Amino acid sequence: MSRGSGAGYDRHITIFSPEGRLFQVEYAFKAVKTAGITSIGVRGKDSVCVVTQKKVPDKLLDQSSVTHLFPITKYIGLVATGITADARSLVQQARNQAAEFRFTYGYEMPVDILAKWIADKSQVYTQHAYMRPLGVVAMVMGVDEENGPLLYKCDPAGHFYGHKATSAGMKEQEAVNFLEKKMKENPSFTFDETVQTAISALQSVLQEDFKATEIEVGVVRAENPEFRALTTEEIEEHLTAISERD
């Protein structure tokens, strides 16, 4: 076996290759892209919004049972991109942690603390031979009393960062390029602008116009900081506004 080939170093999650790579963690990132979904998050001046594709793989499936948007608490939402089964496991643990936090301290778990907890959990999965990383990138969103709207992204390696706008999944880089142009002037988006920027970014990278039933939109607003998913009718209104504007 040649030292630089990488062969043998992808068997165990805890062993670095001679080039300093952890192959199993890299494969987890590939699993996120292989799911074929793209998600986008945008932070406005008084709201935060995430948009993700809703692909129903089987015509016999009940559409309402397919989702990548998960409420963690009443005030925090999470959009999971990647392997859905891994996402549900992560969501359940995050809900338990948030409930425990509220019971212990008497107030809701802040968005940044939850994002850090998810990242810490993911990081531990990269250290032990008997575990595997989760094939999920999670975007966590909410409105903080002190810091306003917050959007965090947590990945399988255990990174977590706050973002003005971000993307995950198959067309991540294209979406980031689009968002960088949109956010260059550091705009203060209203609620409608925030939602429509996120939706139009997804339209741009997928190069297609989609129906309201083919995407999911999750929002949190400062005036009413509860996480909720927009209805099909509300999404339709935003799609109409985008097409009229363009």
From Swiss-Prot:
Regions that span the bilayer: none
Any single Gene Ontology cellular-component annotation: plastid
Tissue: Ubiquitous low levels, higher expression in siliques and flowers.
Function according to Swiss-Prot or TrEMBL: The proteasome is a multicatalytic proteinase complex which is characterized by its ability to cleave peptides with Arg, Phe, Tyr, Leu, and Glu adjacent to the leaving group at neutral or slightly basic pH. The proteasome has an ATP-dependent proteolytic activity.
Gene name as annotated: PAA1
Gene source species: Arabidopsis thaliana
Superkingdom of the source species: Eukaryota
Protein name: Proteasome subunit alpha type-6-A
CDD domains, alphabetized: proteasome_alpha_type_6
The protein's assembly and partners: Component of the 20S core complex of the 26S proteasome. The 26S proteasome is composed of a core protease (CP), known as the 20S proteasome, capped at one or both ends by the 19S regulatory particle (RP/PA700). The 20S proteasome core is composed of 28 subunits that are arranged in four stacked rings, resulting in a barrel-shaped structure. The two end rings are each formed by seven alpha subunits, and the two central rings are each formed by seven beta subunits. The catalytic chamber with the active sites is on the inside of the barrel.
Record's subcellular location: Cytoplasm; Nucleus
